[in-house]
Amino acid sequence: MCFDKKIHGVAALTTHILAVLAIFSSEFSLPTWENIQVLLIGTILCRGPRRISSVLRVMGLASVRNFSKYHRVLSRAEWNSLALAKILFGLLIKLLPESWPILIAVDETLERRRGKKIKAKGVYRDAVRSTQSKVVTSFGLKWECMMLIVPLPWCKRSWALPFLTLLAPSKKSNEKAGRRHKTSLDWTRQMVKLISRWLKKSWILVGDGAYACMDLAATCIKQNVTLISRLRLDAQLFEFPVYEEKKLGRKRIKGKRIYLKNILVDQKQIWQTGIVNWYGGEKKTIEYLTFICLWYHAGIPPIPLRIVLVKTPNGKSEAETFFSTNVNLDPVQIINYFVLRWNIEVTFEETRAHLGVETQRQWSDKAIARTTPLLMGLYSFVTLVAFKMNQIKALASIEAASWYDKKGELTFSDILALVRRDILFKKHFSKSENKPDLRKCTDKMINALIYQLSIAA
C-alpha cells in the first residue's frame, strides 16, 4: 500500500477516505494504484461529464504530458473488477444492523450510447421515455445491477448501494463475436451463484416482474436464496396434489389449477388487513389474501410459493400479485421487502444526476466494461466515507439555512457535497504538518479550484 505525498491525489485523501480506500490497494499494481488515487478524487470532485480529461482538469493536471497513463487504468491495466466488487460488498455488509436481513435488489438499466466502436450496444426499450401506450427504443448498453438495501442514520428511507454491475451484451453483438448469448435472467442466475459463494449463507433477492422466472426461482432455492417478485395474474399456479392410496401409476406432481382472477371475484374469500411501509416512507393499510401453492410448467419441477394478493391502496388498478419462494415468510413482510426494491430506481437516477453515468466516452471494450461499474460502485464508496464521517460527528446538510431546514433527512447530493467539502478543505486549506502556518496554494491549485467553481454543473 502506497500513499506517497508526491502523488497529486494523495494530498486530498482525507482520513475517512483512507480508511475505506486502503482495503482495495492489494488489487492493484503500484503504478496503477497511484493513478487510481488521482482518478478517484478527481471523479468525486468533478461536476458534469465524468471523462478522464475533465478529471485531470479538476486535479490541476491539465498540462501534464503523460496523461495517457490515466486512460490506461481503464483500457489496459490489469486488475479484477469482481475482486473489487467482493471487497465492496464486504464493507457494505458491515453497515447492516444485526436485525436487518441481507436484502439485495436486482434490476437492469440502460446506458444510452452510440458509435461504431461500441460493440456491445443494442436497441432496447427505454423505460424512462416509454409509457404504457407508447414504447420508445434507444441505442445503448444494458447493465445488470445488484444493490444491497441498507438503512442509514441520516435518512428514514433505506438506500440501495450498488456493489456488482455487469455488462449484458446484445444478442446481435454476441452473434457477431461468436459467443453464446445470455439473457438478463442468465446473467442474474450467474450473479446469484457468485454472491452465494461470497456470503455462504442465506439472503433475499428482490426484483420486479421481469425476474418472475421459474429457472431463476429454482436457482435461488438451490443456492439457499429467497426470491421475492411480482407475478402475473395468469401465472400457472396449482394446488398441492392429493395422493390416493392403492392407486397404481406415477404419483401426481400437481393438483387443480388455481386461477387468480377467479379468486379476486370470489365473494367467499376472506381478505385480511395489514399495515405496510409504503413508498415515500408512509404507512399504508392494505387488504391482502395469502395462500401457498405450486408454480409449475412442463419440464421444470414444481416450485412451492407463498402468494400474496394485494388490493392497491388507491384502488385505481386491479390487485397486485407478489410471491416468495420462502413459504414461511410473513405476507406483510413480503410486501415490505418488495417496496424496498424501489430504492434501486432512486440510485439509478442519482448516479446519472450526480456521478455522470452515461456521460463517459470510452470506446475500448475493456474500458466500457469497467467505467460504469466503477461509477456505480463510487455511489457506495461515497456512502461508506460519509458513514465514517457520521461516526465522528453527525452529518448535517450544508444547504441548511434559517429559511430552509431539511429536518435531518439527507440525500445523496448532500452526502456528496459533504465529502467534497472534506476533500477540498484537506487539499487547499489544511494546515501544514510541520508548521502552524497555512499552506500556500500554488498557481495550479488555484487554477484548478477556480475551474471547479466556474464550470457548469
In which residue ranges do the predicted regions lie?
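Single, function-defining residue in the core of a domain
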Residues: 2-24, 28, 32, 59, ...
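Short, basic, glycine/proline-bearing loop/turn elements
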Residues: 73-78, 199-202
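Short coil/turn segments at secondary-structure boundaries
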Residues: 36-37, 52-56, 85-86, 348-354
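Gly/serine-rich nucleotide phosphate-binding loop at the start of the catalytic core
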Residues: 9-75
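Active-site-proximal, Lys/Arg-enriched surface segment
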Residues: 76-166, 290-295
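Short gly/ser-rich anion-binding loops that grip negatively charged ligand groups
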Residues: 45, 60, 78, 99, ...
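Generic alpha-helix structural propensity
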Residues: 35, 47-51, 65-69, 79, ...
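Amphipathic alpha-helical interaction elements
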Residues: 44, 76, 93, 339-340
